[in-house]
UniProtKB/Swiss-Prot annotation:
A biological process term (GO) from this entry: DNA-templated transcription
Name the record gives this protein: DNA-directed RNA polymerase subunit beta'
Function: DNA-dependent RNA polymerase catalyzes the transcription of DNA into RNA using the four ribonucleoside triphosphates as substrates.
Bias-annotated ranges (Acidic residues): 1256-1268, 1294-1304
Sequence positions that bind Zn(2+): 241, 315, 322, 325
Molecular function (Gene Ontology), one example: DNA binding
Cofactor remark: Binds 1 Zn(2+) ion per subunit.
Keyword annotations of the record: DNA-directed RNA polymerase, Metal-binding, Nucleotidyltransferase, Transcription, Transferase, Zinc
EC number: 2.7.7.6
Cofactor(s) essential for the protein: Zn(2+)
Low complexity composition bias: residue spans: 1269-1278
């Protein structure tokens, strides 16, 4: 009997029969075997079920005392000496090094790709690591069984094998922070000490561990919160809902291995149907019977594979679960009590282990083959025979070895020399590593048998870069190329099948932009010879100026002056103005200009250089502008105003404008009122002039207050006047008989508080000359380019414009503007100060048009380029024409050699190749050569009999007694690789040659642990979903090249096509039968699709109600199993019923598609039970039923969709939830725990359960009986004689409750 069996034999159905008050305590059997963690757990459980809490506590106490007693008798400690490194370690490492050396050699010969080399290295180290671990354990076992380290790890006191392995074996492979495995393992252990490199690599993992833990805690806490919120209102409210429904429990499998056994899943359940023995037809258990450990074992031993049990998923209790459907309360192995808050228990049971789930374990390079394929090694030496009908296709393993892949299940036979025969079954997809008739040694690897869907292994496409290890010229060997152009017009080149890219060694020079080679292919150059040169050319020509600059780091500058102009008549002085320096220009005519462009800056065409300081054209306040005879044009930027073309008079009608933004209540004057200067027109605003007020307001907000100066005359009837408002009146022209102005005025009609009136406003006149009074400077250079300073008058306003201002306004500006002749307007002029030739104290302004050319500084040769040398070809003051060369930069060869690789044609030459003596190698021969000139040889190939080639390369010449090789390096690229170079390209060392596209195995751990649980419970669409079968049928599978063509022939003969996305691998074979909703490719299933497929399928044969229920049932099963798989894979045990409660909350709603005659609206989410009741009512009244689709809600969505808006609002999106509840006038019935906690009432669970339940079901007053005020007497045997304890597991309490019931 297994140890577990021995214990759980005791976990009998004592609730049903055993230890009533008068039954003697059952005898205690003597047990004599080793007790580990698991056995200890079973022991306590057994004692608890058999003898109750008090005795178990006593026993646990005794065990503790026992443990401490012996733990303190003696002790072990570990010293450095105890860390014994297995002696065979060195030899194993050497073996691994040799294997890897061989793989690297194959890689340098171009026989395997970079990916295959990497994979081989990783797998080799993993295997060796395991072997060292075994050796280590054997070493301890045989030579030093009492070693303290070994004892600790072995007994489970501290540490485990993998930790000991790091102490005395080897630390093994490490992953980098991106999760890629570094192919340099840590060969040492902590006992020997790590090298510096190993230490750095090793510290990656430690940091990652800390960060992960911190993130995990937060994630796990949030998951628990969402779970509690979704299931907090699930409380046991009924004893039995009486449902006939149930769910089928069976073994939970993952591939071939049992994850949870049926026996384990049955314990604590209530049966929904009688269980009948399959052979004897004897009834083993009846419906509604609880399953304890004994019964579960009996059922499992009878060979029954499926049992129908009651479950929270099928419970029909309204908004809760009943005791029968929930089953045992796991805390004390008997039926759950009424009022138990099972929802919260479920949520915490699922959420709590969250922290133990890894975020995602490191993604190990390849999976160790052990998991995916079973390795077959020859049990004896012999010959392999294949049967005639064995169908295989050639296949390349992930280590780059040639093998055969079996297409149809079959077997192979191994025949020994002494007539031994052994046959091995080969399943479809297995790999044969030997050929028919091959001789094999004992323990040689013959084949890897693929296990049917063993681990949920899937592959993903990944890319790996192939990098050139040497500089040189590209040569493709037997590499057919396919060209693809995408929609954007980008062309990619891919390899159609595998081939070689050779890099022929040579020195590659990168040429700078604009460099031209001065040598031809085949030229011989010496060190220091010029290979290429760039010329520096002037664009515009002019006079050379070489500025004095000490800063030669960035190279020297050469300036070429195209044109210059000096203001001979004006001198420059500096004033400081408001703490800033200001440059002023005084002309000989006494005018002063402010420089707008400071010396040292550049000025473009039509930009302002200086502006005249002039107060003649300054007004006192704002006003109206009128032009008389002035013509203007807009030139240059808008904000500079209008240029005056024709002079004339500018008429200015002053007015004072206050722009305000205040309430109208603050206004102190009326519209049209005449005010004196200094009046407060608005609070805190005073006017400067006397005049008539105009108030501009909008929506009782003041915008502007305008004060118009002038003389006001009241008139009775302004309409009779001949002069219109807004006209200019000349002096002496009468307006009315009584009014004759003596100067030019502007007439305006106004409405005053006293009545209509005329306002005569004074007009100021400014005379503007045709030409400004400033001379224009001009100069023309030898090249014919001219530059000048032109004086311009600009008016900032247009005719009739109102200028809003309180203070003074400039009405005319006189500016000096730079003009460069039109053929080169993009040039800019530099502003410089120069000393006067006669008087050094006087500084003049000079404008120069410069072209600045930068000379490259000389560069010493490095790996990728030769040294450069720049020669200047001009002197200070030289006059040069445009297009002249002023300097040449030469690129010099580093070593002597022959020039190659200059491509003829239109393409720009960016690189030049020189083949030097370093790139050639001479091999002396003893016999005739068996290679030809031009042949590509790999390292190790024979050049002549018995003479292997020391290098890979190309044969350049064969002379008597020697072969001249040009070194080269072959790189194997696999089919489908993306090529980054073309044939004949020149590459530097470190350039990318190609991207290898390969499939790498994704182990189940990619989305594993917490992220996967969250994805499931939030019902999210997985990233790479599998294809699901929509109807049952038979698979028909054919291949179009690499692309699978997948069809399913359904029962009625319909053929349905399924499209398989690239990167998805099939998990079905030709002719395989599939059921509805079965996955056809690898990857996680999308639960929403699953629900839809099941619903559509069942609807064709059953009614909507039945179909919805069955579809939801299937999806519920899927969820329970998936969640269990994740937790079990991490070694966490959770009872199914907890997951079922949460899943029930996720799958209880349907979406209304059409309300029919009901009061439901389309799109509404309703409980399935509710809508089925409504439809039943409709069937009686003859109305049209509501149509609906079952939906799946993630836990967050389900929490927000509960009946209780208080609970939803306290979870997330408070404002939205409360607003909607208010608009819809919702009521909260306070059924759950959370609502009641928030309101501050007693919660309806535990003792508070009865409070509310009784209020609900209170009897009529006349039926009420007198209740005894005290409890009925205690049964005498409640107090046990021996340990004087009331024990809550003694069924005396049950009797108490029964008495209560009888009295009620």
């Amino acid at each position: 009997m297994s140890e577990k069996g021995r214990f759980s034999a005791g976990l009998s159905r004592q609730a049903a029969d055993g230890n009533k008050a008068d039954a003697p305590l059952p005898p205690v059997p003597f047990r004599n075997y080793q007790i580990g963690k698991k056995e200890l757990r079973n022991l306590i459980a057994w004692s608890f079920a058999r003898y109750g809490t008090a005795r178990t506590a006593q026993m646990a106490d005794a065990l503790k005392t026992l443990g401490f007693k012996y733990a303190t008798q003696a002790a072990v400690s570990i010293s450095v000496e105890d860390l014994r490194v297995p002696p065979s370690k060195r030899q194993l490492l050497a073996q691994a090094e040799a294997e890897i050396e061989a793989a690297t050699e194959r890689y340098t010969r171009g026989e395997i790709t970079e990916v295959e080399r990497y994979q081989k290295v990783i797998d080799t180290w993993n295997q060796i690591n395991d072997q060292i671990k075994e050796e280590m354990l054997n070493n301890f076992r045989q030579n030093d069984p009492l070693n303290s380290v070994y004892m600790m790890a072995n007994s489970g006191a501290r540490g485990n094998v993998s930790q000991v392995r790091q102490l005395v074996g080897m630390r093994g492979l490490m992953a980098n922070p991106q999760g890629r495995i570094i192919d340099l393992p840590i060969k040492t252990n902590f006992r020997e000490g790590l090298t510096v490199t190993e230490y750095i690599i090793s510290s990656y993992g430690a940091r990652k561990g800390l960060v992960d833990t911190a993130l995990r805690t937060a994630d796990s806490g949030y998951l628990t919160r969402r779970l509690v919120d979704v299931s907090q209102d699930v409380i046991v409210r009924e004893s039995d809902c009486g449902t006939e429904q149930g769910i089928l429990l069976e073994y939970l499998m993952d591939g071939d291995k049992v994850v949870v056994s049926l026996e384990e899943r049955l314990v604590g359940r209530v049966l929904a149907r009688d269980v009948v023995h399959p052979q004897t037809q004897e009834i083993l258990a009846r419906r509604n019977q609880e399953v304890d450990h004994d019964l579960a074992r009996t059922i499992a031993e009878a060979g029954i594979r499926q049992v129908m049990v009651r479950s929270p998923l099928t419970c029909e209790a309204n908004r809760s679960v009943c005791r029968m459907c929930y089953g045992w309360s796991l805390a004390h192995s008997r039926l759950v009590d009424l009022g138990e808050a099972v929802g919260i228990i479920a949520a915490q049971s699922i959420g709590e282990p969250g922290t133990q789930l890894t975020m995602r374990t490191f993604h190990t390079g390849g999976v160790f083959t052990g998991e995916v394929a079973r390795q077959i090694r020859a049990p004896f030496a012999g010959v392999v025979r294949f049967p005639k009908n064995l169908r295989t296709r050639p296949f390349r393993t992930r280590h780059g070895d040639d093998a055969l892949q079996v297409e149809v299940n079959n077997q192979i036979i191994l025949e020994g020399p002494d007539g031994q025969r052994e046959s091995f079954d080969m399943t479809q997809g297995s790999t044969l590593l030997v050929r028919d008739g091959a001789q094999v040694q004992r323990d040689q690897l013959i084949a890897e048998v693929s296990l049917a869907k063993a681990s949920r292994k899937s592959t993903e496409k990944a890319q790996k870069e192939v990098v050139a290890d040497l500089a040189g010229e590209i040569r493709f060997a037997d590499l057919p190329i396919e060209e693809k152009t995408d929609r954007q017009g980008n062309t990619t080149y891919t390899a159609q099948r595998q081939g070689l890219i050779w890099v022929m060694s040579g020195q590659v020079y990168n040429l700078p932009p604009g460099a031209e080679p001065v040598v031809k292919n085949g030229d011989r150059v010496q060190a220091g010879d010029v290979i290429a040169e760039t010329s520096l050319v002037t664009e515009h020509g002019g006079i050379v100026r070489l500025p004095e600059r000490s800063d030669t780091r960035s190279g020297r500058e050469v300036e070429i002056i195209n044109a210059s102009v000096v203001l001979r008549e004006a001198r420059v002085r500096v004033e400081s103005h408001q703490g800033r320096e200001q440059f002023l220009l005084d002309t000989s005519s006494g005018q002063t200009f402010v420089l707008k462009a400071t010396p040292g800056t550049k000025v473009g065409n039509d930009e302002v250089v200086a502006e005249l300081i002039d107060n003649h054209f300054r007004s006192q306040t704002g006003g109206l502008v009128k032009f008389a005879g002035i013509e203007v044009a807009r030139r240059g930027k808008a904000k500079q105003g209008y240029e005056v073309i024709q002079g004339g008079t500018l008429l200015w009608i002053p007015e004072e404008t206050h722009e305000v933004n205040k309430d109208i209540s603050l206004l102190n004057v009326d519209d049209g009122q005449y005010v004196e200067a200094g009046t407060e027109v608005v609070k805190d605003i005073f006017c400067q002039n006397a005049g008539v007020v105009e108030v501009i307001q909008k929506n009782d907000i003041l915008r502007e207050i305008v004060i118009k100066p002038g003389s006001l005359h009241l008139v009775d009837n302004p309409a009779d006047l001949e002069v219109k408002s807004g006209t200019l009146i000349q002096p002496g022209q009468p307006v009315l008989s009584s009014i004759v102005p003596d100067r030019l005025v502007y007439l305006e009609h106004v409405e005053t508080p006293e009545g209509p009136g005329l306002l005569l406003r004074p007009v100021q006149e400014y005379e503007i000359p045709d030409r400004p009074l400033v001379p224009t400077q001009e100069s023309t250079s030898e090249s014919g380019r001219s530059i000048r300073l032109r004086a311009v008058q600009r008016v900032p306003f247009k005719d009739g414009e109102r200028v809003k201002s309180v203070g003074p306004v400039e009405l005319l500006r006189t500016q000096l503007v730079l003009e460069i002749d039109t053929d080169a307007p993009q040039l800019k002029a530099d502003i410089e100060l120069i000393q006067d030739e006669k008087d050094p104290d006087i500084r003049r302004l000079q404008l120069v048009i410069l072209e600045t050319l930068l000379l490259r500084r000389d560069v010493e040769a490095d790996l990728t380029q030769g040294s450069t040398h720049t020669r200047l070809l001009v002197k200070e003051g030289d006059s040069i024409a445009s297009g002249d060369v002023i300097a040449r930069t030469e690129i010099q060869a580093k070593k002597a050699g022959i020039v190659q690789g200059i491509r003829e044609g239109a393409e720009v030459v960016r690189r030049v190749l020189v083949i030097t003596d370093d790139d050639l190698v001479q091999v002396p021969l003893t016999g005739p050569a068996n290679v030809e000139v031009g042949a590509l040889v790999r390292v190790g190939d024979e050049l002549a009999p018995g003479i292997p080639s020391p290098q890979s390369g190309q044969v350049m010449q064969i002379t008597d007694g020697q072969v001249l090789l040009r070194m080269a390096r072959p790189y194997l690229v696999s089919a489908g690789a993306i090529l980054q170079v073309r044939n004949g390209d020149l590459v530097q060392r470190g350039d990318s040659l190609a991207l290898l596209v390969f499939e790498r195995a994704k182990t189940g751990d990619i989305i594993q642990g917490l992220p996967r649980i969250e994805e499931l419970l939030e019902a999210r669409k997985p990233k790479e979903m599998c294809v699901l079968a929509k109807r049952p049928g038979t698979v028909q599978l054919s291949w179009r090249g690499e692309e699978p063509d997948l069809k399913v022939i359904e029962a009625d003969g319909t053929v349905r096509d399924y499209s398989v996305l690239p990167g998805q691998s099939l998990i079905v074979v030709d002719g395989q039968p599939v059921g509805v909703g079965d996955p056809l490719t690898d990857g996680p299933a999308n639960p929403h699709d699953l629900l839809e497929i099941y619903y559509e399928y069942h609807r064709q044969t059953l009614g909507d109600d039945q179909a919805a229920r069955l579809a939801l049932r299937e999806v519920q099963r899927f969820f329970v199993n998936e969640v269990q798989n994740v937790y079990r894979s991490q070694g966490v045990e959770i009872s199914d019923k907890h997951i079922e409660i949460v899943v029930r909350q996720m799958t209880s709603k349907v979406r209304v598609d059409d309300g029919g005659d009901t009061i439901l609206l389309p799109g509404e989410l309703v409980e399935l039970r509710e809508i089925q009741q409504i439809n039943a009512t409709m069937a009686i009244t003859g109305g049209a039923p509501a149509k609906y689709t079952p939906v799946l809600l993630g836990i967050t969505k389900a929490s927000l969709n509960t009946d209780s808006f208080i609970s939803a609002a306290s979870f997330q999106e408070t404002t939205r939830v409360l607003t909607e509840a208010a608009i819809e006038g919702k009521s909260d019935w306070l059924r759950g725990l959370k609502e009641n906690v928030i309101i501050g009432r007693l919660i309806p669970a535990g003792t508070g359960f009865t409070t509310y339940e009784e209020i609900a079901a209170e009897p009529e007053p006349d039926e009420e009986e007198e209740e005894p005020a005290v409890l009925p007497e205690l049964p005498p045997r409640l107090i046990l004689e021996d340990d004087q304890l009331i024990d809550d597991s003694t069924p005396a309490f049950d009797e108490l409750e029964e008495d209560d019931d009888e009295e009620e």
